[in-house]
Amino acid sequence: MSHLDQVIDQEKPDRRIVVAALGVTQILAWGSTFYLLGVLANEIARNTGWSYDWVTSGVSVGLLMAGVVSPRVGRAISKWGGRLTLAVSAVLLAAGLLLLGSCQSIAWYLVAWLLLGAGMGSGLTDAAFSTLGSIYGENARGPITSLTLFAGFASTVCWPLSAYLIEHLGWRGACFIYAAIQIGFALPILLLALPRGPSVPPPTADDEGARSRASLASGELPIFALLAVVLTLSAAIFSMVGIHLLPLLQARGLELSAAVGLGAIVGPSQVGARIVEMLIGRHYHPIWTMISSAVLVAAGTALLFAAFPTYSAAIVLYGAGNGLGSVARGTLALALFGSSRYPVLMGHLALPILMSMALSPFLASIAFQVKGATLTLGLIAFLGATNVLLVGLLWILCRRRPTAAEID
């Protein structure tokens, strides 16, 4: 073992500490950005007189900005590790929340979301996955799967917290408290728990297989492009269902309380599927996790479209598939392209994923308003079925690689 390897091994922290630190900070980051307006939007619109549509567009603005910065974030994590990048994210989120809480016009409100978007792009799921890849290399699959368990509790933790803060401090006070949490709690945790640099040694100049961390061989380009399409389509389905599930169920004749009860099934279904993956996933290639995810999501959305007598079965299937999809999003690229290129490639994959999450709810909203719930659910089911075919093609391409034996 070289001196560099010894230093890296000594500085590599306990996986449980790193995953716990990232898990807690991911809950806070998601809860103070993507899930923030789920509770604050109505209060902001009522208090300011701004259009509700303009208020809720803040998340889309943030996701678009996150997509723009994500490729640079991947390169930064590849070069310097995730500690500095995630710390910068906490500072950006705090600054964005401070501006959000003090803004007096819709223009400054959207500027605040641009700042929050920069923090989202440098600190949410893909950045956290890339950080784990830079620390643990080829052994990052287990930590990535464990981290996804935490993410499923972001709304569970932060929606009640946001509601409590609004009741006692108002929406502006809630933003200020979340800003303080980012600086006073999340930032120190990240600085203390994460190593100073990547634990995966950088490629040397004479390493022909690593001339560039982002380079792809000609045979890898179709696989990477198809993986990007699959993940983007998966993100579109997730965003459409996540935003419109309750209104779609109500349009099908369900009462609000019944729709909310069904929607609550998604979270436990996601976590349950991730626990199963954590227990048995190491025994098979991540492409099978992706296949399982696509099939379950397609089955769930098809049953929703068909008005299956038991909606709960459809939502359990969808939730389980979505939960596995989050794991596959973090582990499949690692398995296909290796750890040295992983942070950079994850940054490039995050760009279309985040753009899709920002724009697809608008498309679903237009379909819902113009053609109604049945056509909208049909569109989502069609996308789910299409993704199964694309994942099947991805499996075929992966099997043709020289290392395809491990996929069987």
For every predicted segment, state its role.
Residues V69-G81, A273-H285, F368:
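Helix-to-loop junctions at the C-terminal end of transmembrane segments
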Residues V91-Q104, L296-A307:
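C-terminal ends and interior cores of transmembrane alpha-helices
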Residues L37-A41, E220-G272, M278:
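Extracytoplasmic gate region of multi-pass secondary transporters
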Residues V266, Q270, H283-L332:
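C-terminal transmembrane helical hairpin of 12-TM major facilitator-type secondary transporters
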Residues V18-Y52, S70-V73, W159, V241-L246:
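Extracytoplasmic
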Residues F150-G197:
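Helix-loop-helix hairpin linking two adjacent transmembrane segments in secondary transporters
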Residues S122-Y136, L324-F337:
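Intracellular juxtamembrane helix-capping segments at the cytosolic ends
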Residues I27, A107-G123, T232, Y311-L324:
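Hydrophobic core of transmembrane alpha-helices in multi-pass small-molecule transporters
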